[in-house]
Amino acid sequence: MEANGNSETGINPFVSNLSILNIFFSLSLTVFSFGIVIYLENNAISVLYAGVGLTLGQIILLGTSILQGRAIDKGYSFQLMVTGSILYGAVLFLIYFTVSIGYIPSLLIIAFIPLMLVFEGVFRSSLNAFIAKAAAARALGKNYSRILTSEAIGSALAYVVMVYGAFSLSLSLVFVSSSILLVFIALLSFFFLRSRERDIMRKAESSVRRPGFRESIRNLSSKKNFAIPLITSKAFMTIGIIGFTFFYVPTGVYLGISPEYSFTFLLITYLLAILIGKYGEKVLDRHQGFGRGFVSLNMMFDVITYGLVVLSIIYRVDYLFLIAALFASPGVLLVSGAMTYEVGVIGRESRGMFGGVQRQFIGVISAFVSFPLTYIFTRNPSYMWGIIFAASLISFIITFTIPSAFPSTGAVPVN
C-alpha cells in the first residue's frame, strides 16, 4: 500500500508519478543511447560525428553544472525536471526529423547530441536532488529504489521496442514515437496528475535549508576525504558507461551477433533489474548502514561485465559477450544504496552543489575520452574495451579509499 504524502517510512504517491515519467524518459534515453550509432550508420553518417557531439556535450556540461547545482540548492529542482524532460523529448524528435529529410544531418547531429546530454543531465540531476530533499529521510533508499526500478522498466521497454519495432518496422519510427510519448507524459505528470501530493513534496523540498555559495563550498571541503575518492571513482566508472551504452550493440555486430540478440539479453538484464529493484526496497530498509559496501559492489560488477566483454572479443566466444550484460542487473539495488549513503554524508542542503562539482570533474574526463573511445572503436573494438576494463578496475580499487564512517553527519556505514 502506498504511503500518504507525509509518511516518514513510505513512498509519496507523487514519487510513483515521477516513476512513470522516468519509465518513458528511460525509454527515450535508451532508444537514443543504444540506437544512435546504428541510426547514423543506417543513414550513411560517420560514427565519428557522434564522438564529436559527445565531446562537445561534456564541454557544455562543464560550464552549466555548477550553475545547475546552485539552482537545485535554491529550490528549483522541480522546474529543472520539467524543463529537462520536455526538451529532451523535443530534441530527440528533431534528430528524427533532421535525418529523415536529409538536411545537412552531419552538422546538426553534432549540435543535437550535446543538447541531449545537457537535457539528460538537467532531468536526472534535478530528479535525484528533488527526491533527496523532498522524501522522508527514513524512506530515502526506498524512494530511490522506486525511481531506479522505473528506470529499469523503461530500459526494458526500450529493448522490446528496439527488437520488435526498430528492426521489424523502422528505427526512425521508434525515435519519433518515443519522443512524442515522453513530452506527453511529462506534461501529464507535472501539471495534471497527483497535484496534492506534488505540492506536499515541493513544500518539503522548499523547507530544506538553502546555504549560500561559500557555505556550500565549505561544507563540501569538510567532506573532501569522502568526496574526492568517490568522485574520482565515478569518473573512471563513467568511461565504462560511455563505452557500454554507445558501443555494446555495435561490438556485438563486430563479433557477428545480430542486434536483436544483443537487445534481447539487455532486455533480460533489465527484467532481472526490475525484480531486484522491487526486492531492493526492503533490503535498503534493513541495511541502511551498509554504505560504502554498495559503492564497492557496484564497481565490482562493472569489472566483471567489462572483463567478460574483453574475453569474448579475444576468444570470439559469443555467449560470454551476451552474458556480460546480465551482471549489470544488480545496479538498481546497489546504486540506490550508494545514493542514499551519499546524501547521508553530504547532507540534503548541499546535494545540488555536490552534484555540480561531481559533474564538473566527471565532465572533464568524459570530454577527454568520448571522441578517442569512438575513434579507437572504429579501429579496433578490443582496444577500446581493454581501456574500459582497466578504468573499471581502477574505479573499483579507489572505492576502498572512501572512509567508512562520518560521525558528524550521522552516517555510519558498515564495511
What are these regions (language model features)?
Residues 5-59, 226-233, 237-256, 262-266:
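Helix-loop boundary and gating motifs at the non-cytosolic
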Residues 23, 105-123, 319-334:
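Hydrophobic core of transmembrane alpha-helices in multi-pass small-molecule transporters
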